[in-house]
Amino acid sequence: MSSFKKVVLAYSGGLDTSAIVPWLKENYGCEVIAFVADVGQGAEELEGVEAKAIASGASECYVVDLKDEMVSDYIYPTLKTGSIYEGTYLLGTSMARPIIAKAQVEIARKVGADALSHGCTGKGNDQVRFESCFAALAPDLQVIAPWREWDLSSRESLLDYLAERDIPCSASATKIYSRDANAWHISHEGGELEDPWCQPSEKVWTWTNSPEQAPDKAELVTLNVVEGEVVAVNGEQLKPYDCLVKLNDIASPHGVGRVDIVENRLVGMKSRGCYETPGGTVMMAALQAIDELVLDKASRKWKEVLGGEFAHLVYDGRWFTPLKDSILAGAEALSKDATGEVVLKLYKGQVTAVQKQSPHSLYSEAFATFGEDDVYDQSHAEGFIRLFSLSSRIKALAKK
C-alpha cells in the first residue's frame, strides 16, 4: 500500500466510518482528519460526533454546516429543472453528495492532506458520486475506499474489529436498515426491503405518518413562487432551507412524500429503496402547478427533456461538469416567468394543487370556456386539422 501523511475522511459517526479511522492509520500509516457534513440529518445524528471521531483515533474533527448552501445552491437549482429520476425519485441522496465532496476537499486543502477517504461500499452509487466530484475538484489528491480493499465484510466483523482495539461504538449487530438522511429526505434500504415482494412494515418509515394514521381532515398550504423558487409558506417569507423545514413539518404528519421504488443503480444493478421526502414533494407539486400556467407547449416539452437529462446527471454524480452548467442555464431561462401562488391540499399521503395563479399565466378563460365566447371561431379548426393531418392523408393515399 502507498503511504500518506494525512487523510481527510468523510465521517458520519456510524459503524463503518468508526472502523475506517483506525484501519487507515494501521494500513497507511497516516494521520486521519474526520470531516462531518451537517446537511440537516438532525441533532441526534450529530450529537457527540466529534468525541466519537477522536475516540476512534482521528486527530481532529471538523463539523461543517452545509444546510443553507445545500438547499439554496443544489436543491433549488435542481428543482428548477423539474428533475425526477426514473419518474419517482426526488434525488435526495444524490443532491447532497456534491456539496459534501466539495466541503471535504476544502478541509483537505485547509489541513494540507494528501488523500481523501469515504465509507461508500463497492456496490453502490455513492462511491462513483464522491470520486467523480473529487476528480473534478482535486485531481491531485489520492482516494482511499476501504470497502474496496479490506476483508471486513459484515457488521459483526466491524464490531469485532473495533472491540479488539477498545474503540467504543454504540452500533449493534442487529441493525436492519441502512439509512441516509438530510434536510430533503431520508432513505431506507436493506432488511426485508431487499425482497421486492415484501411489503415494507411501518417500522421502515421514521419521518412520515402512514396515510392510515394521517389526520382525517385535509390541510391547505399556500406557497409563493418567484422565478421557480419557493420564497414563502403560508404568507411567511423564508430562506430556502427554512421553507423546506417548515414544509417538512407541515407535510410529514399527512403521510406526504413516501415512495417505494426499485431503481437502476449507476453501477448496473437494481436496488430497492423506500424514501420519505415530505416538504420536497410539496415544493415539486407547487412548481409543476406554476409551470402548467406559464410554459407554452414547446417549452414544457423541452423542460421535460432537460429535467430527464439532469436527473441522470445528478444521480450519476456529474455535478461539477460543463453539462450541469448548461442545463441549469436553460432551466433559469425557462423559470423566468415561473412566478405565482399555489394552494395545495394535503390529505392522507396525497398532494393536490387546488388553486394556482400567476401574473404570467398563459391560461385564458375566454379561449378555454365551454360556454359561449366571441374570441374563438371554431370553424377555423377545420383548416388547421387538414394541414395538421396532411402527412397522414398523403401516406394513406399512397397505399391505394
Curated annotation (Swiss-Prot):
Pfam families, per database record: Arginosuc_syn_C (PF20979), Arginosuc_synth (PF00764)
Reactions accelerated catalytically: L-citrulline + L-aspartate + ATP = 2-(N(omega)-L-arginino)succinate + AMP + diphosphate + H(+)
Annotated SUPFAM superfamilies: Adenine nucleotide alpha hydrolases-like, Argininosuccinate synthetase, C-terminal domain
GO molecular function: argininosuccinate synthase activity; ATP binding
Keyword Nucleotide-binding recorded: yes
Keywords: Amino-acid biosynthesis, Arginine biosynthesis, ATP-binding, Cytoplasm, Ligase, Nucleotide-binding
InterPro entries registered for this protein in UniProt: Arginosuc_syn_C, Arginosuc_syn_N, Arginosuc_synth, Arginosuc_synth_CS, Arginosuc_synth_type_1_subfam, AS_cat/multimer_dom_body, Rossmann-like_a/b/a_fold
KW Membrane (keyword) present: no
Major localization listed first in the record, in broad terms: cytoplasm
Single GO biological process annotation from the record: urea cycle
E.C. no: 6.3.4.5
Family membership noted in the UniProt record: Belongs to the argininosuccinate synthase family. Type 1 subfamily.
Subunit structure: Homotetramer.
Record-listed L-citrulline binding positions: 89, 94, 125, 129, 178, 187, 263, 275
CDD domains in the record: ASS (cd01999)
Gene3D superfamilies: Argininosuccinate synthetase, chain A, domain 2 (3.90.1260.10), HUPs (3.40.50.620), Single helix bin (1.20.5.470)
Pathway: Amino-acid biosynthesis; L-arginine biosynthesis; L-arginine from L-ornithine and carbamoyl phosphate: step 2/3
UniProt GO cellular component terms: cytoplasm
Subcellular location: Cytoplasm
Protein's UniProt name: Argininosuccinate synthase
Species, as recorded: Pseudoalteromonas translucida (strain TAC 125)
Signal sequence bounds: none
Residues the record lists as binding L-aspartate: 121, 125-126
Binding site for ATP: 10-18, 37, 119
